[in-house]
UniProtKB/Swiss-Prot annotation:
The protein's role, per its UniProt record: Protein S19 forms a complex with S13 that binds strongly to the 16S ribosomal RNA.
Source organism, top-level taxon: Bacteria
Pfam family, one: Ribosomal_S19
Regions that span the bilayer: none
Similarity-based family: Belongs to the universal ribosomal protein uS19 family.
InterPro entries: Ribosomal_uS19, Ribosomal_uS19_bac-type, Ribosomal_uS19_CS, Ribosomal_uS19_SF
Protein name, UniProt field: Small ribosomal subunit protein uS19
GO cellular component, one term: small ribosomal subunit
Length: 91
């Protein structure tokens, strides 16, 4: 179910503060965050945000097409290594 429009998008306050600070001083270093649940706002465009995937921080460069999506969508938590090959098919 989608979030109500009257509530607005959810963004952690500490992330907004870090983004505003980075924009003010024009800092290009990645902003490290564990907040995968935060919605990407237009203020984030052009910044690199390092999103935690459970093991490490994955750098995500924010573009205008990402606005409205969650940060966690761009930092995958699972690695798919493929299904095991069928030994009978190889022979």
């Amino acid at each position: 179910m989608a979030r109500s429009l009257k509530k607005g998008p959810f963004v952690d306050h500490h992330l907004v503060a870090k983004v505003e600070k980075a924009v003010a001083i024009k800092d290009k270093k990645p902003i490290k965050t564990w907040s995968r649940r935060s919605t990407i706002l237009p203020d984030f465009i052009g910044l690199t945000i390092a999103v935690h995937n459970g093991k490490q921080h994955v750098p995500v460069y924010v573009t205008d097409q990402m606005v409205g999506h969650k940060l966690g969508e761009f930092a995958l938590t699972r690695t798919f290594k493929g299904h095991p090959a069928d030994k009978k098919a190889k022979k």
